[in-house]
Amino acid sequence: MAENKKFSIRKKRECSYPTFRTLYEFNKFFLRYKTEISKIQRRTSSLIQYEEHSSAIFIYYETPQMFDLATKALQTLYNSHTREGETKAASKWYRNPRKDFPSQEAALVRKKKRDALILKKYLLNVDPSLSFRAEGLFTLPSDDLDVYEFFGGENLTLFNQVRVDCQCYIHYLPKLAAFYVRCDSVKNLKVALKRVKHIFYEQVSLIRLERTQPILHLMNFDDYSTSYELFYDRNFPLAKKYKPNSIYLHRLPESIPTPVDSVKINLIRERSFNLLKNFVSASLFNVFLFSGTVFMRVKVGIPLFERLKVGTNKVKNNSVNIAQSFLEPQTRSTFLRYLFSDEVSVKVCHVLKELRSPTGEKLFESFSDDPITAVHFEVMNCKGVQDTLTAIWNTNSGKPSGWYLESTMYKALDVTYYNLNTLSWNLYIEYGHPTQNSTFYKEFISNISMSDDGRIYFMNTRDIKVRSLVVKLKHKYWHLSSGFHLHITRFEAHDMGKVKDIDTDFEPGLQCYQVGSDTSVLRYGLSFWDPKWDYLLADNQHKQQWQAPSYKPLISEFFPMGIEHFIETAQSIVMAVNRSTID
């Protein structure tokens, strides 16, 4: 075949894979899969040529990375459409996976019948004089709750699944204000008491939230603005915008009108900002950004705050002394999260390094010039099981520096602080480890790479295909005066094959996604983390859920100066950043 002049400036190299058994199979492959091969050429910016009589394959490429991608894509294409790689039945199943199987359906029916018989047995009222090998009580911390009303009547139907799984009797003793659990196994008793405890506190938190009066919470840090957005959302999503049905203001002065159908209060006097800040209830309840105004969201109930995911903090700047002692894998976290508009966020990333205090001192220091990139792949394997695989880059190109599966993550620490009258919080650390039986996932991750221009390459195989992906670019900064870590994160989501202008699909083979090409779901976030918490948790990161931590699970351990002080410090940082975007 004649060479195309457009590709004459590129390097030419013979490709040794895939290997074909006969010359007929070789020519048939290139004639039959012209469309798929042209797709590989388009996504790798390369040219693939073959010689009909010698079975030689040549690739014209720009970079060695593109040559490797084109070679692997050809091999994947060959494996996916031949008897060695995938049978016709498997190929048909791949396109239309079967979800129900007769044997599984029969087993499910048998399990339902068996569970119904077990539940019928353990719902009976047992003679109190009978003794069991294992008996235990869970005493309610508060007796002002109507147990029968909120836990499923006299039979306490909310605990039915616990009865079935642990094969135990569960009753409520009003005089003792306790749940009475009896069974024939000490192991089952411990599990049952633990699950009863979790269900109780979860239900109590929901009840407390339902009884809470819907209060508007306002946090604004722009002293230069004369218009303030009021926003309330009962369900606490991060970025839901709609007009509130009602607004409750607390002890507002008469000079400020109370809106009924409007979401704006126009402030007349300069001091109105402080008046509004003092008189509007701004408890730990809501965090939002709405039309450029920074709001704050902190969860109430269970959990109040969380530490999520696992990552590796590699500190390149020698002046960040504290973080250097935590180079081992540790959690990426969120406690306070602020949402910014796109324009503000882009500007913030540019001005943080140049920000100075009134005395001329530097305010922020960057952890690295390159952002940390995390890509969450929502995948489905050949058995129809969905999972989320996360790949993390600490550099701006090349292979991922780490990866983990959501399904293989486990809790190394779980501490819950309950206070039925005020706030409760739950702190846990999740660690991800590649599973020992993840051959398909290891093959999938081996084909993931990122180019210098922000293109993410991966392979849909006969065993795993990607349904959607989320790209997160995190810029990490060190606030020098407070010691807080400040993370500005860009969130971008894409559904494979859903956008016509983006060259992605569900078919086996090479896929390429350009970061920034799908802005249909795009938002920015700002989060804070106190590195001192790492010292409290470093000794407990490998402890199992049932093991007690080495510290007291009290709010004072994490907030020795109070949660309010932590929030006020974070707010002051946001004020400084927000002012810089206006100047």
Curated annotation (Swiss-Prot):
Entry-linked InterPro entries: DUF7905
Name the Gene Ontology biological process terms: silent mating-type cassette heterochromatin formation; siRNA-mediated pericentric heterochromatin formation
Q: Which domain of life is it from?
A: Eukaryota
List, alphabetically, the GO terms of the cellular component aspect. Answer: nucleolus; nucleus; pericentric heterochromatin
The record lists the membrane-crossing segments as none
Designated name of the protein: Uncharacterized protein C582.04c
Q: State the species of origin.
A: Schizosaccharomyces pombe (strain 972 / ATCC 24843) (Fission yeast)
